[in-house]
């Protein structure tokens, strides 16, 4: 082995979780449902292919359609930790990969000097020992089997996308002071985008692609009743059909599944049996986040 190289045989997430090795897409869909996540067949197939082919999965769709929740649910199905990297404008490699614990390094130098140690080269060498390394999400994902969620990658800049390309190409990184670190088992990697900007084709080419739509009325009813077992079928149906009508309006921010669940929970807490104008007025803040949108929806429900 080359000095400084830490490498293991790359296994897929399916192989790394032995008892799941024979799962097919339908069994994944059923397993997701058991966690409370109602997935479409195409999403379950995309997950199965991502694991089978050792490829990242790029999930795109409007905010609130369940992209992040799908990663969480899949981590539960695989019984693996979820490691999440939340992207934002200005994020760089040190915040995503690793950094050095500068305060502890300074303490080490002072302790060495107090102990009468004068070998400058040895002190400098010890400063970059692994114990002073702060593992950020991407490095942690190389160190243990996991589901890696790179959330809202569209918020990051072009330079960070280029950095991700290198990481996702072979699930390995080189730390100059330590050497190369490669994954024992490449993580099931899920990237999400809310389409606030176009993500470069080069990054998408590394991945399998899946677009998540707002759910159909039937699927939204199932989602609501799965997540809120105490709700009646009639109220769940009225919520789902009303939300579908609302999404057709010209809104600043159309409600996603997360918001429809919040609205359903709010109506349930209010003891609603149906959506009366009065209850709608009291509860629309759970569904919509802009006053102009609320005014439009109030007019719709009053008509």
Spans of model-derived segments:
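Extreme N-terminal basic, low-complexity initiation segments
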Residues: 1-9
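C-terminal regulatory/interaction module of P-loop NTP-utilizing enzymes
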Residues: 9-303
């Amino acid at each position: 082995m080359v000095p400084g190289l830490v490498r293991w045989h790359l296994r897929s997430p399916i192989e790394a979780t032995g008892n799941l090795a024979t799962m097919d897409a339908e069994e994944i869909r059923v397993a997701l449902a058991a966690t409370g996540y109602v997935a479409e067949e195409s999403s379950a197939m995309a997950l199965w292919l991502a694991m089978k082919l050792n490829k990242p999965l790029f999930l795109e769709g409007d905010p609130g359609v369940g992209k992040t929740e799908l990663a969480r649910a899949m981590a539960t199905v695989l019984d693996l930790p979820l490691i999440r990297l939340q992207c934002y404008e200005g994020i760089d490699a040190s915040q995503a990969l690793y950094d050095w614990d500068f305060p502890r390094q300074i303490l080490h130098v002072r302790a060495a000097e107090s102990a009468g140690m004068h070998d400058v080269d040895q002190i400098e060498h010890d400063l970059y020992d692994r114990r002073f390394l702060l593992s950020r999400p991407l490095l942690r994902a190389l160190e243990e089997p996991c589901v890696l969620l790179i959330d809202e990658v569209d918020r990051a800049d072009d330079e960070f996308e280029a950095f991700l390309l290198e990481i996702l190409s072979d699930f390995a990184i080189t730390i100059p002071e330590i050497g190369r670190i490669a994954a024992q088992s490449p993580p099931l990697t899920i990237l999400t985008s809310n389409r606030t900007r176009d993500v470069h084709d080069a990054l998408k080419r590394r991945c399998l692609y899946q677009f998540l739509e707002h759910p159909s009325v039937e699927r939204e009813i199932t989602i609501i009743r799965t997540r809120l077992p105490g709700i009646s079928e009639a109220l769940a149906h009225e919520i789902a059909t009303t939300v579908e009508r609302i999404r057709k309006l010209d809104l600043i921010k159309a409600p996603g599944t997360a918001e429809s669940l919040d609205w359903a929970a709010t109506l349930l807490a209010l003891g609603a049996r149906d959506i009366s104008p009065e209850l709608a007025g009291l509860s629309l803040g759970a569904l919509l986040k802009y006053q102009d949108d609320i005014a439009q929806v109030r007019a719709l429900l009053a008509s």
